[in-house]
Amino acid sequence: MKDRGLLAQVPEETRIALLTAAGRVSHPTRLESIKLSRAIRAQNRRRLDAQDRKTRASTTIRRTRAAGVFVAPARVLIGQAPQEERELQKPRFCYVCKAEFRKLHFFYDSMCPSCAEFNYAKRHQSAPLDGRVALVTGARIKIGYQTALMLLRAGAGVVATTRFPRDAALRYSREPDFNAWKDRLRIHGLDLRHFPSVELFTRYLTSSHERLDVLINNAAQTVRRPPGFYAHLLERETAPLTDEPPEIRALLESHEACVAALSVGAAKELGNGNAADVCGLALRGAKGPGMGLTHSAMLSQIKYTLDDALGEEVFPAGKTDADLQQVDLREKNSWRLTLAEVSSAEMLELQLINSVAPFILCSKLKPLMLRRPTNEKHIVNVSAMEGSFSRGTKTDKHPHTNMAKAALNMLTLTSAPDYAKSGIYMNAVDTGWVSDEDPALHAARKKDELDFQPPLDIVDGAARVCDPVFSGLLSGRHSWGIFFKDYKPAPW
Protein backbone atom coordinates (compact mmCIF):
# COMPACT_ATOMS: atom_id res chain seq x y z
CA MET A 1 0.00 0.00 0.00
CA LYS A 2 1.51 3.32 -1.09
CA ASP A 3 -0.52 5.55 1.25
CA ARG A 4 -1.08 3.95 4.63
CA GLY A 5 -2.91 7.10 5.67
CA LEU A 6 -5.94 5.78 3.85
CA LEU A 7 -6.35 3.27 6.65
CA ALA A 8 -7.34 6.16 8.92
CA GLN A 9 -10.58 6.42 6.96
CA VAL A 10 -11.44 2.82 7.83
CA PRO A 11 -13.31 2.15 11.09
CA GLU A 12 -10.94 0.98 13.79
CA GLU A 13 -12.50 -2.45 14.20
CA THR A 14 -12.33 -3.10 10.46
CA ARG A 15 -8.79 -1.67 10.28
CA ILE A 16 -7.56 -4.03 13.00
CA ALA A 17 -9.20 -7.03 11.30
CA LEU A 18 -7.65 -6.05 7.94
CA LEU A 19 -4.15 -5.63 9.37
CA THR A 20 -4.46 -8.89 11.28
CA ALA A 21 -5.50 -10.74 8.12
CA ALA A 22 -2.69 -9.12 6.11
CA GLY A 23 -0.21 -10.16 8.77
CA ARG A 24 -1.38 -13.77 8.64
CA VAL A 25 -1.09 -13.79 4.85
CA SER A 26 2.46 -12.39 4.91
CA HIS A 27 3.56 -14.40 7.94
CA PRO A 28 1.42 -17.57 8.05
CA THR A 29 1.77 -20.21 10.70
CA ARG A 30 3.35 -23.52 9.75
CA LEU A 31 -0.06 -25.21 9.67
CA GLU A 32 -1.47 -22.48 7.43
CA SER A 33 1.48 -22.83 5.05
CA ILE A 34 0.87 -26.57 4.82
CA LYS A 35 -2.84 -26.08 4.11
CA LEU A 36 -2.07 -23.50 1.42
CA SER A 37 0.46 -25.78 -0.26
CA ARG A 38 -2.00 -28.65 -0.23
CA ALA A 39 -4.72 -26.49 -1.72
CA ILE A 40 -2.43 -25.29 -4.51
CA ARG A 41 -1.31 -28.85 -5.28
CA ALA A 42 -4.90 -30.07 -5.32
CA GLN A 43 -5.90 -27.25 -7.66
CA ASN A 44 -3.00 -28.10 -9.97
CA ARG A 45 -3.98 -31.78 -9.92
CA ARG A 46 -7.55 -30.91 -10.83
CA ARG A 47 -6.32 -28.70 -13.66
CA LEU A 48 -4.00 -31.40 -15.01
CA ASP A 49 -6.69 -34.06 -14.59
CA ALA A 50 -9.15 -31.91 -16.52
CA GLN A 51 -6.62 -31.44 -19.31
CA ASP A 52 -5.89 -35.18 -19.43
CA ARG A 53 -9.59 -36.03 -19.45
CA LYS A 54 -10.04 -33.74 -22.44
CA THR A 55 -7.03 -35.29 -24.18
CA ARG A 56 -8.24 -38.85 -23.58
CA ALA A 57 -11.72 -37.91 -24.73
CA SER A 58 -10.27 -36.92 -28.11
CA THR A 59 -9.13 -40.48 -28.90
CA THR A 60 -11.25 -42.44 -31.36
CA ILE A 61 -12.11 -45.23 -28.95
CA ARG A 62 -13.64 -42.73 -26.51
CA ARG A 63 -15.41 -40.69 -29.16
CA THR A 64 -16.97 -43.90 -30.46
CA ARG A 65 -18.25 -44.78 -26.99
CA ALA A 66 -19.79 -41.35 -26.62
CA ALA A 67 -22.21 -42.19 -29.43
CA GLY A 68 -25.58 -43.61 -28.47
CA VAL A 69 -25.08 -46.82 -30.48
CA PHE A 70 -21.74 -48.52 -31.09
CA VAL A 71 -20.57 -48.44 -34.69
CA ALA A 72 -17.11 -49.85 -35.39
CA PRO A 73 -14.87 -47.02 -36.66
CA ALA A 74 -13.49 -47.43 -40.16
CA ARG A 75 -9.81 -48.26 -40.53
CA VAL A 76 -7.43 -45.32 -40.78
CA LEU A 77 -4.55 -46.14 -43.11
CA ILE A 78 -0.92 -45.26 -42.49
CA GLY A 79 -0.36 -41.63 -43.37
CA GLN A 80 -4.02 -40.75 -42.89
CA ALA A 81 -4.02 -40.79 -39.10
CA PRO A 82 -4.40 -37.45 -37.31
CA GLN A 83 -1.00 -35.79 -37.01
CA GLU A 84 -1.59 -33.58 -33.98
CA GLU A 85 0.38 -34.52 -30.88
CA ARG A 86 -1.65 -35.82 -27.95
CA GLU A 87 0.37 -35.77 -24.76
CA LEU A 88 -0.85 -36.37 -21.24
CA GLN A 89 0.14 -34.06 -18.40
CA LYS A 90 0.51 -37.02 -16.06
CA PRO A 91 2.03 -40.35 -17.17
CA ARG A 92 -0.04 -43.54 -17.27
CA PHE A 93 0.84 -47.21 -17.34
CA CYS A 94 0.22 -49.09 -20.57
CA TYR A 95 -2.64 -51.60 -20.39
CA VAL A 96 -0.57 -54.15 -22.33
CA CYS A 97 3.14 -53.81 -21.46
CA LYS A 98 2.71 -51.81 -18.21
CA ALA A 99 5.36 -49.26 -19.28
CA GLU A 100 4.88 -45.59 -18.38
CA PHE A 101 3.79 -43.32 -21.23
CA ARG A 102 2.57 -39.81 -21.97
CA LYS A 103 2.06 -39.68 -25.74
CA LEU A 104 -1.35 -40.91 -26.85
CA HIS A 105 -2.18 -42.90 -29.96
CA PHE A 106 -4.98 -41.38 -32.05
CA PHE A 107 -7.21 -44.42 -31.38
CA TYR A 108 -6.35 -45.88 -27.95
CA ASP A 109 -6.23 -43.98 -24.66
CA SER A 110 -4.70 -46.70 -22.46
CA MET A 111 -1.69 -47.93 -24.43
CA CYS A 112 1.80 -46.71 -25.09
CA PRO A 113 2.46 -45.74 -28.74
CA SER A 114 4.23 -49.02 -29.54
CA CYS A 115 1.51 -51.30 -28.15
CA ALA A 116 -1.20 -49.09 -29.64
CA GLU A 117 0.27 -49.37 -33.15
CA PHE A 118 0.56 -53.15 -32.82
CA ASN A 119 -2.99 -53.53 -31.50
CA TYR A 120 -4.41 -51.24 -34.16
CA ALA A 121 -2.77 -53.30 -36.92
CA LYS A 122 -4.08 -56.54 -35.36
CA ARG A 123 -7.54 -54.99 -35.07
CA HIS A 124 -7.75 -54.86 -38.86
CA GLN A 125 -5.93 -58.11 -39.62
CA SER A 126 -7.58 -60.63 -41.93
CA ALA A 127 -6.73 -63.74 -43.94
CA PRO A 128 -8.25 -65.47 -46.99
CA LEU A 129 -10.93 -67.87 -45.71
CA ASP A 130 -12.79 -68.40 -48.98
CA GLY A 131 -14.50 -71.77 -49.07
CA ARG A 132 -14.02 -72.43 -45.37
CA VAL A 133 -16.81 -72.75 -42.80
CA ALA A 134 -16.80 -71.42 -39.23
CA LEU A 135 -19.17 -71.95 -36.31
CA VAL A 136 -19.46 -69.05 -33.84
CA THR A 137 -21.57 -69.42 -30.71
CA GLY A 138 -23.11 -66.38 -29.03
CA ALA A 139 -22.93 -64.38 -32.26
CA ARG A 140 -25.83 -61.97 -31.76
CA ILE A 141 -24.04 -59.14 -29.96
CA LYS A 142 -20.69 -57.77 -28.85
CA ILE A 143 -17.55 -59.89 -29.38
CA GLY A 144 -19.35 -62.84 -30.98
CA TYR A 145 -21.09 -60.57 -33.46
CA GLN A 146 -17.86 -58.80 -34.41
CA THR A 147 -16.06 -62.15 -34.67
CA ALA A 148 -18.65 -63.45 -37.11
CA LEU A 149 -18.35 -60.26 -39.17
CA MET A 150 -14.56 -60.60 -39.35
CA LEU A 151 -14.86 -64.19 -40.57
CA LEU A 152 -17.56 -63.31 -43.10
CA ARG A 153 -15.52 -60.41 -44.46
CA ALA A 154 -12.55 -62.76 -44.75
CA GLY A 155 -14.61 -64.94 -47.09
CA ALA A 156 -15.76 -67.71 -44.74
CA GLY A 157 -19.19 -69.19 -44.46
CA VAL A 158 -20.44 -68.68 -40.91
CA VAL A 159 -22.91 -70.65 -38.82
CA ALA A 160 -23.93 -68.33 -35.97
CA THR A 161 -25.83 -69.46 -32.89
CA THR A 162 -27.86 -67.37 -30.46
CA ARG A 163 -30.95 -67.70 -28.30
CA PHE A 164 -32.58 -64.92 -30.32
CA PRO A 165 -32.03 -65.75 -34.00
CA ARG A 166 -34.43 -63.21 -35.49
CA ASP A 167 -32.97 -60.32 -33.58
CA ALA A 168 -29.52 -61.49 -34.69
CA ALA A 169 -30.65 -61.67 -38.31
CA LEU A 170 -31.99 -58.13 -38.10
CA ARG A 171 -28.67 -56.87 -36.74
CA TYR A 172 -26.64 -58.50 -39.51
CA SER A 173 -29.04 -57.25 -42.19
CA ARG A 174 -28.31 -53.67 -41.13
CA GLU A 175 -24.58 -53.93 -41.91
CA PRO A 176 -23.63 -51.73 -44.88
CA ASP A 177 -21.89 -54.62 -46.68
CA PHE A 178 -24.63 -57.17 -45.91
CA ASN A 179 -25.20 -58.02 -49.57
CA ALA A 180 -21.55 -59.01 -49.98
CA TRP A 181 -21.75 -61.95 -47.56
CA LYS A 182 -25.41 -62.60 -46.75
CA ASP A 183 -25.42 -65.85 -48.75
CA ARG A 184 -22.63 -67.22 -46.53
CA LEU A 185 -24.35 -66.59 -43.18
CA ARG A 186 -26.66 -69.04 -41.44
CA ILE A 187 -28.21 -68.26 -38.05
CA HIS A 188 -29.47 -70.92 -35.63
CA GLY A 189 -31.44 -70.55 -32.43
CA LEU A 190 -29.73 -72.50 -29.65
CA ASP A 191 -29.82 -72.30 -25.86
CA LEU A 192 -26.54 -73.78 -24.64
CA ARG A 193 -27.99 -74.44 -21.19
CA HIS A 194 -29.97 -77.35 -22.67
CA PHE A 195 -27.11 -79.73 -23.36
CA PRO A 196 -29.23 -82.39 -25.17
CA SER A 197 -30.05 -79.67 -27.70
CA VAL A 198 -26.36 -78.87 -28.08
CA GLU A 199 -25.66 -82.49 -28.96
CA LEU A 200 -28.62 -82.57 -31.35
CA PHE A 201 -27.24 -79.48 -33.03
CA THR A 202 -23.83 -81.09 -33.53
CA ARG A 203 -25.46 -84.09 -35.14
CA TYR A 204 -27.52 -81.89 -37.41
CA LEU A 205 -24.43 -79.99 -38.52
CA THR A 206 -22.55 -83.23 -39.12
CA SER A 207 -25.36 -84.55 -41.31
CA SER A 208 -26.05 -81.31 -43.21
CA HIS A 209 -22.59 -79.78 -43.73
CA GLU A 210 -19.69 -80.99 -45.79
CA ARG A 211 -16.99 -79.34 -43.72
CA LEU A 212 -16.16 -77.30 -40.64
CA ASP A 213 -12.85 -75.46 -40.48
CA VAL A 214 -13.16 -73.14 -37.49
CA LEU A 215 -15.01 -73.54 -34.19
CA ILE A 216 -15.26 -70.44 -32.00
CA ASN A 217 -16.66 -71.25 -28.55
CA ASN A 218 -17.51 -67.64 -27.76
CA ALA A 219 -20.87 -67.82 -25.99
CA ALA A 220 -20.56 -67.22 -22.27
CA GLN A 221 -22.59 -66.03 -19.33
CA THR A 222 -20.87 -63.60 -17.00
CA VAL A 223 -23.80 -61.67 -15.55
CA ARG A 224 -27.08 -63.52 -15.35
CA ARG A 225 -29.99 -61.50 -16.68
CA PRO A 226 -33.53 -62.15 -15.37
CA PRO A 227 -36.41 -62.86 -17.78
CA GLY A 228 -37.48 -59.20 -17.79
CA PHE A 229 -34.20 -58.27 -19.45
CA TYR A 230 -35.15 -60.25 -22.57
CA ALA A 231 -38.91 -59.74 -22.57
CA HIS A 232 -38.84 -57.08 -25.30
CA LEU A 233 -37.31 -59.57 -27.75
CA LEU A 234 -40.06 -62.16 -27.54
CA GLU A 235 -42.67 -60.48 -29.74
CA ARG A 236 -40.44 -60.75 -32.79
CA GLU A 237 -39.03 -64.17 -31.91
CA THR A 238 -42.48 -65.75 -31.52
CA ALA A 239 -44.29 -64.06 -34.42
CA PRO A 240 -44.95 -66.03 -37.63
CA LEU A 241 -41.77 -66.27 -39.69
CA THR A 242 -43.74 -65.07 -42.70
CA ASP A 243 -43.89 -61.65 -41.03
CA GLU A 244 -40.15 -61.26 -41.59
CA PRO A 245 -38.74 -59.76 -44.80
CA PRO A 246 -37.15 -62.18 -47.31
CA GLU A 247 -33.57 -61.31 -46.34
CA ILE A 248 -34.27 -62.25 -42.71
CA ARG A 249 -36.01 -65.50 -43.64
CA ALA A 250 -33.07 -66.48 -45.83
CA LEU A 251 -30.67 -66.25 -42.88
CA LEU A 252 -32.93 -68.55 -40.85
CA GLU A 253 -33.56 -71.23 -43.49
CA SER A 254 -30.98 -73.60 -42.03
CA HIS A 255 -32.43 -73.20 -38.54
CA GLU A 256 -35.93 -73.90 -39.78
CA ALA A 257 -34.64 -77.00 -41.56
CA CYS A 258 -33.04 -78.16 -38.32
CA VAL A 259 -36.28 -77.66 -36.37
CA ALA A 260 -38.25 -79.44 -39.10
CA ALA A 261 -35.86 -82.39 -38.96
CA LEU A 262 -36.36 -82.61 -35.21
CA SER A 263 -40.14 -82.54 -35.66
CA VAL A 264 -40.01 -85.38 -38.16
CA GLY A 265 -37.89 -87.41 -35.79
CA ALA A 266 -40.23 -86.70 -32.89
CA ALA A 267 -43.18 -88.06 -34.85
CA LYS A 268 -41.58 -91.52 -34.71
CA GLU A 269 -42.44 -92.81 -31.27
CA LEU A 270 -40.52 -95.41 -29.35
CA GLY A 271 -42.28 -98.48 -28.02
CA ASN A 272 -42.31 -97.03 -24.50
CA GLY A 273 -44.19 -93.92 -25.61
CA ASN A 274 -41.32 -91.51 -25.27
CA ALA A 275 -40.68 -89.03 -28.06
CA ALA A 276 -37.79 -90.07 -30.28
CA ASP A 277 -35.55 -87.57 -32.06
CA VAL A 278 -33.46 -87.82 -35.17
CA CYS A 279 -30.36 -88.36 -33.06
CA GLY A 280 -31.61 -91.23 -30.94
CA LEU A 281 -32.15 -89.24 -27.75
CA ALA A 282 -35.45 -89.72 -25.92
CA LEU A 283 -37.05 -86.97 -23.85
CA ARG A 284 -39.59 -88.21 -21.36
CA GLY A 285 -42.88 -86.41 -21.45
CA ALA A 286 -41.68 -84.02 -24.13
CA LYS A 287 -43.78 -83.04 -27.13
CA GLY A 288 -40.60 -83.05 -29.16
CA PRO A 289 -36.86 -83.08 -28.76
CA GLY A 290 -34.42 -80.23 -28.67
CA MET A 291 -36.28 -77.50 -26.80
CA GLY A 292 -33.03 -75.54 -26.75
CA LEU A 293 -33.28 -75.43 -30.55
CA THR A 294 -37.03 -75.13 -31.02
CA HIS A 295 -37.74 -72.71 -28.15
CA SER A 296 -34.41 -71.00 -27.52
CA ALA A 297 -35.96 -67.56 -27.02
CA MET A 298 -38.77 -68.71 -24.74
CA LEU A 299 -36.35 -70.53 -22.44
CA SER A 300 -35.03 -67.10 -21.44
CA GLN A 301 -38.29 -66.60 -19.54
CA ILE A 302 -37.76 -69.41 -17.06
CA LYS A 303 -37.82 -67.91 -13.55
CA TYR A 304 -35.87 -69.41 -10.69
CA THR A 305 -34.41 -66.62 -8.56
CA LEU A 306 -35.85 -63.77 -6.53
CA ASP A 307 -34.77 -61.11 -8.99
CA ASP A 308 -36.66 -62.90 -11.75
CA ALA A 309 -39.74 -61.09 -10.46
CA LEU A 310 -38.17 -57.74 -11.32
CA GLY A 311 -39.77 -55.81 -14.13
CA GLU A 312 -39.91 -52.38 -15.66
CA GLU A 313 -38.55 -50.67 -12.55
CA VAL A 314 -35.09 -52.05 -13.38
CA PHE A 315 -35.62 -52.84 -17.07
CA PRO A 316 -37.25 -49.65 -18.38
CA ALA A 317 -39.18 -50.19 -21.59
CA GLY A 318 -37.54 -48.82 -24.71
CA LYS A 319 -34.22 -48.02 -23.00
CA THR A 320 -31.21 -49.69 -24.64
CA ASP A 321 -27.45 -49.30 -24.35
CA ALA A 322 -24.72 -48.84 -26.97
CA ASP A 323 -25.05 -52.51 -27.99
CA LEU A 324 -28.83 -52.15 -28.35
CA GLN A 325 -29.31 -54.31 -25.27
CA GLN A 326 -31.90 -53.67 -22.58
CA VAL A 327 -30.69 -51.25 -19.91
CA ASP A 328 -30.25 -53.04 -16.57
CA LEU A 329 -30.69 -50.80 -13.50
CA ARG A 330 -30.26 -53.45 -10.81
CA GLU A 331 -28.06 -52.25 -7.95
CA LYS A 332 -26.27 -55.61 -7.69
CA ASN A 333 -25.57 -58.30 -10.25
CA SER A 334 -23.60 -61.54 -10.61
CA TRP A 335 -20.29 -59.70 -11.00
CA ARG A 336 -20.43 -58.58 -7.37
CA LEU A 337 -21.57 -61.84 -5.78
CA THR A 338 -19.42 -63.85 -3.37
CA LEU A 339 -19.56 -67.62 -3.03
CA ALA A 340 -22.37 -67.70 -0.47
CA GLU A 341 -24.47 -65.30 -2.56
CA VAL A 342 -24.48 -67.25 -5.84
CA SER A 343 -27.57 -69.40 -6.27
CA SER A 344 -27.08 -73.06 -7.13
CA ALA A 345 -29.20 -72.65 -10.25
CA GLU A 346 -27.07 -69.80 -11.55
CA MET A 347 -23.87 -71.70 -10.83
CA LEU A 348 -25.12 -74.73 -12.75
CA GLU A 349 -26.39 -72.88 -15.80
CA LEU A 350 -23.18 -70.90 -16.03
CA GLN A 351 -21.13 -74.12 -16.09
CA LEU A 352 -23.40 -75.50 -18.81
CA ILE A 353 -22.90 -72.45 -21.00
CA ASN A 354 -19.25 -71.67 -20.31
CA SER A 355 -17.65 -75.11 -20.12
CA VAL A 356 -20.06 -78.00 -20.74
CA ALA A 357 -21.36 -76.74 -24.10
CA PRO A 358 -17.82 -76.08 -25.44
CA PHE A 359 -16.87 -79.61 -24.30
CA ILE A 360 -19.75 -81.10 -26.32
CA LEU A 361 -19.06 -78.97 -29.38
CA CYS A 362 -15.33 -79.74 -29.38
CA SER A 363 -15.88 -83.47 -28.96
CA LYS A 364 -18.90 -84.09 -31.18
CA LEU A 365 -17.85 -81.85 -34.08
CA LYS A 366 -14.41 -83.41 -34.46
CA PRO A 367 -15.59 -85.87 -37.16
CA LEU A 368 -17.04 -82.99 -39.19
CA MET A 369 -13.84 -81.00 -38.85
CA LEU A 370 -11.86 -84.02 -40.12
CA ARG A 371 -14.16 -84.66 -43.06
CA ARG A 372 -12.10 -82.30 -45.22
CA PRO A 373 -8.55 -82.74 -43.91
CA THR A 374 -6.54 -79.57 -44.51
CA ASN A 375 -4.23 -79.62 -41.48
CA GLU A 376 -5.41 -76.02 -40.93
CA LYS A 377 -8.43 -76.42 -38.64
CA HIS A 378 -8.86 -74.25 -35.57
CA ILE A 379 -10.78 -74.29 -32.30
CA VAL A 380 -10.73 -71.11 -30.24
CA ASN A 381 -12.10 -71.35 -26.71
CA VAL A 382 -12.89 -67.82 -25.59
CA SER A 383 -11.68 -67.63 -22.01
CA ALA A 384 -10.66 -64.89 -19.59
CA MET A 385 -7.98 -64.03 -17.08
CA GLU A 386 -10.54 -64.87 -14.38
CA GLY A 387 -9.84 -68.52 -15.23
CA SER A 388 -6.08 -68.24 -14.83
CA PHE A 389 -4.47 -69.73 -11.72
CA SER A 390 -1.39 -67.53 -12.19
CA ARG A 391 -3.38 -64.33 -11.76
CA GLY A 392 -2.54 -62.86 -8.37
CA THR A 393 -5.09 -60.05 -8.28
CA LYS A 394 -8.35 -61.98 -7.94
CA THR A 395 -11.05 -60.68 -5.65
CA ASP A 396 -13.58 -62.84 -3.81
CA LYS A 397 -16.31 -62.01 -6.34
CA HIS A 398 -17.97 -64.17 -9.08
CA PRO A 399 -16.29 -67.49 -8.13
CA HIS A 400 -18.68 -69.41 -10.40
CA THR A 401 -17.44 -67.49 -13.45
CA ASN A 402 -13.82 -68.05 -12.45
CA MET A 403 -14.27 -71.80 -12.06
CA ALA A 404 -16.04 -72.12 -15.42
CA LYS A 405 -13.26 -70.32 -17.27
CA ALA A 406 -10.66 -72.37 -15.40
CA ALA A 407 -12.45 -75.52 -16.59
CA LEU A 408 -12.40 -74.26 -20.18
CA ASN A 409 -8.69 -73.54 -19.88
CA MET A 410 -8.05 -77.06 -18.60
CA LEU A 411 -10.08 -78.53 -21.45
CA THR A 412 -7.84 -76.63 -23.87
CA LEU A 413 -4.59 -77.53 -22.14
CA THR A 414 -5.54 -81.21 -21.88
CA SER A 415 -6.98 -81.86 -25.35
CA ALA A 416 -4.97 -79.52 -27.58
CA PRO A 417 -2.07 -82.00 -28.04
CA ASP A 418 -4.48 -84.76 -29.07
CA TYR A 419 -6.35 -82.59 -31.58
CA ALA A 420 -3.13 -81.16 -33.02
CA LYS A 421 -2.23 -84.68 -34.20
CA SER A 422 -5.24 -84.44 -36.53
CA GLY A 423 -4.46 -80.94 -37.75
CA ILE A 424 -7.00 -79.27 -35.44
CA TYR A 425 -5.30 -76.51 -33.48
CA MET A 426 -7.00 -75.67 -30.19
CA ASN A 427 -6.20 -72.57 -28.14
CA ALA A 428 -7.77 -70.44 -25.42
CA VAL A 429 -7.98 -66.67 -25.79
CA ASP A 430 -8.52 -63.88 -23.31
CA THR A 431 -10.52 -61.20 -25.11
CA GLY A 432 -9.15 -58.39 -22.98
CA TRP A 433 -11.03 -55.77 -20.99
CA VAL A 434 -13.75 -54.60 -23.35
CA SER A 435 -16.68 -53.86 -21.03
CA ASP A 436 -17.50 -52.95 -17.44
CA GLU A 437 -19.61 -55.74 -15.95
CA ASP A 438 -20.42 -53.79 -12.78
CA PRO A 439 -24.02 -52.65 -12.22
CA ALA A 440 -24.91 -49.50 -14.16
CA LEU A 441 -24.79 -47.29 -11.05
CA HIS A 442 -21.24 -48.38 -10.16
CA ALA A 443 -20.04 -48.18 -13.76
CA ALA A 444 -21.38 -44.63 -14.08
CA ARG A 445 -19.73 -43.62 -10.79
CA LYS A 446 -16.33 -44.91 -11.93
CA LYS A 447 -16.69 -43.07 -15.20
CA ASP A 448 -17.63 -39.77 -13.54
CA GLU A 449 -15.22 -39.84 -10.60
CA LEU A 450 -12.24 -41.68 -12.09
CA ASP A 451 -12.76 -41.16 -15.82
CA PHE A 452 -12.55 -44.93 -16.13
CA GLN A 453 -13.43 -46.66 -19.38
CA PRO A 454 -12.34 -50.13 -20.54
CA PRO A 455 -9.09 -49.96 -22.53
CA LEU A 456 -10.47 -52.02 -25.45
CA ASP A 457 -13.70 -52.31 -27.40
CA ILE A 458 -15.59 -55.31 -28.79
CA VAL A 459 -13.72 -55.16 -32.11
CA ASP A 460 -10.43 -55.53 -30.22
CA GLY A 461 -11.91 -58.51 -28.41
CA ALA A 462 -13.00 -60.12 -31.68
CA ALA A 463 -9.58 -59.48 -33.22
CA ARG A 464 -7.97 -61.40 -30.36
CA VAL A 465 -10.40 -64.28 -30.91
CA CYS A 466 -9.69 -64.46 -34.64
CA ASP A 467 -5.93 -64.02 -34.34
CA PRO A 468 -4.94 -67.70 -33.91
CA VAL A 469 -6.86 -68.44 -37.13
CA PHE A 470 -5.67 -65.45 -39.16
CA SER A 471 -2.05 -65.57 -37.95
CA GLY A 472 -1.84 -69.31 -38.55
CA LEU A 473 -3.08 -69.05 -42.12
CA LEU A 474 -0.94 -66.00 -42.92
CA SER A 475 2.28 -67.42 -41.49
CA GLY A 476 1.76 -71.12 -42.06
CA ARG A 477 2.68 -71.72 -38.42
CA HIS A 478 -0.32 -72.85 -36.38
CA SER A 479 -0.16 -72.54 -32.60
CA TRP A 480 -1.92 -74.96 -30.27
CA GLY A 481 -2.28 -75.52 -26.54
CA ILE A 482 -1.68 -71.85 -25.73
CA PHE A 483 -3.56 -69.36 -23.59
CA PHE A 484 -3.31 -66.09 -25.49
CA LYS A 485 -3.54 -62.67 -23.85
CA ASP A 486 -3.02 -59.55 -25.97
CA TYR A 487 -1.96 -61.78 -28.89
CA LYS A 488 0.87 -63.39 -26.90
CA PRO A 489 1.17 -66.60 -24.84
CA ALA A 490 0.28 -66.14 -21.18
CA PRO A 491 0.65 -68.42 -18.14
CA TRP A 492 -2.26 -70.73 -17.47
Regions found by a protein language model. Name each.
Residues 120-165:
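Canonical Rossmann dinucleotide-binding motif of NAD(H)/NADP(H)-dependent dehydrogenases/reductases
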Residues 154-172, 183-186, 214-217, 224-253:
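Conserved glycine-rich Rossmann-like NAD(P)H-binding loop of the short-chain dehydrogenase/reductase
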Residues 176-196, 277-294, 299-305, 310, ...:
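Rossmann-fold cofactor-recognition segment
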Residues 257-315, 445-492:
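C-terminal helical subdomain
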